[in-house]
Amino acid sequence: RVAWLAACHIPELAACAIFYGGRVKIPLGGGHPAPIELAGKIQCPVIGFFGNEDRNPTPEDVDDYSRALSAAGVRHEFFRYDGAGHAFQNFPTPERYNEAASEDAWEKVLAFLTRELG
């Protein structure tokens, strides 16, 4: 959610990478809208990585994220990993770490950042 919010509020960002990205559909409190409602403010391309076993965000939440970005005309690409849950790159936590998903996501995010940032 932090990466999503940064992309919404920092127009100078050239790229946004989201890993796991939960709570995007939940209002921030204090009368502020849910981050998903701010998708139209995102001006940079977005890449996202999600585990299909994650409960926050669920695969259905990720579908909603993609629809919101598409409706806002935001170029984005999401990757999902079977057998991976939340924080699948957290190698110090063996019950979360998914080596195959982690390595694939890392290669993809590096390629994305190289392409977008030059």
Residue spans of the language-model regions?
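Short, solvent-exposed loop/turn segments at secondary-structure boundaries
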Residues: 28-31, 60, 99
